[in-house]
């Protein structure tokens, strides 16, 4: 539902709590009694993908705005993110947030992988950095396994 409906349900006691995006509430003029949570946003949040026929006027125009270096960094980050999720048998519906960020402007630069795993009553957070994407995935997977984070994910199944 929309924000009005959610707030009404909260105030009527139908909900114990709700989680809303602060940016949206502020933009819509809601002044709420709230608490800001510090957590990772979903990977690729705000990413826009376009697909068009090669050689068309629109593809030529878009190519002028397209930063190939940034694309390589974001693509590698998403590949790292997806590989890590596969390694830990998680998917986009799992109670985990993962962010892979490239340091610098080149695709083979150093990357940082941060993840948060949410159980019902606790969570685990870790961050790993390495210049080799495959090694980074291995380090993050080892950290996940060493800290029994799978147990937290399994609480939701």
Residue ranges, per PLM feature:
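Small-molecule-sensing regulatory modules
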Residues: 2-157
